[in-house]
Structure formats: C-alpha cells, structure tokens
Amino acid sequence: LAFEPAEEDLMKRQPRSKEDSLVNKRFLGRIILSGIVIGLTAFGFFNFLIQTNHELAYAQTATFTFMAIAQLMHIFNVRKQSGFGLDKSFFKNKPLIGALILSMGLQLSAVYLPFMNELLGTSPLQAGTWGIIFLAASLSTLVVMGLKKAFQLK
C-alpha cells in the first residue's frame, strides 16, 4: 500500500493534527472491527466444516485459506479512506497487484503441493470449498465496509 497513488479528494480533507499519531483511535477502531468480523467468520466457517463431517485437517486448511483470502480482500477496505478500493486506480499500483498474485500463489502452494501438505499439515481443497471460501471472504469484506460506513470509521 506504500505505492498507492494519492486519492483524488486528498487535498479537500482537513489535515491530521501534528499531535495525532498515524494509528489514531479511528484507525485502531477499524483494525479491531476488521479483526473481529474476520475472526468470527473464520470461527463460524470452521465450526460449519466440523459440523458437516469434514476431517479436522480439511477444516483447518479451509479456515487457514479463508483467513488468507479474507486478508487479501480486506486490502480493498483499507486502500481508501472512504468507499471501496477496487476501482481503476487499483491497476496503477503494480507492486500491490504483484503482492496479491504472489500471496495467492503461496496459498495455492500451501494447499496443493504434497511437500507443503506434509510440512504444514494441510490437505487439498475441493472446488466447492473454494466457492464457499470466496463467498465468506466477500461477505466479511462487505460487512466491514458497511460497519465502517455505519460507524463512520473513515
């Protein structure tokens, strides 16, 4: 995110007070809110998988993958102070795109490469599980975005 181009309305905003730290109460509130939403969703997802008779390693792998995907999607909540960060300006940040592709590649490696399965205790996921993971991650991202607006945690 360090390579993010400036937002168009940046100069219209009031400047931050020199006494304020970069991690102020509002920003800390967003971090805590996001952590709670993603954490509760992960807990619910794991519980759902266990209750539907999936093996422990499978449920752990799916939950681990959900958390990785949710964090990748959460980038779109933090790219901009207001609104959603998936717009045309996203494609101007090549390092961020590279980091997302690399992160997804590493996650796929952790899930599907046999030596990584052995090393990390993961197991390959079925295609349908990926659909549920992306749905849950998308919903948690939308919930965080909605709560951010509701509490005006810009």
Which sequence ranges carry the predicted segments?
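C-terminal transmembrane helices and immediately adjacent loops/tails
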Residues: L1-K154
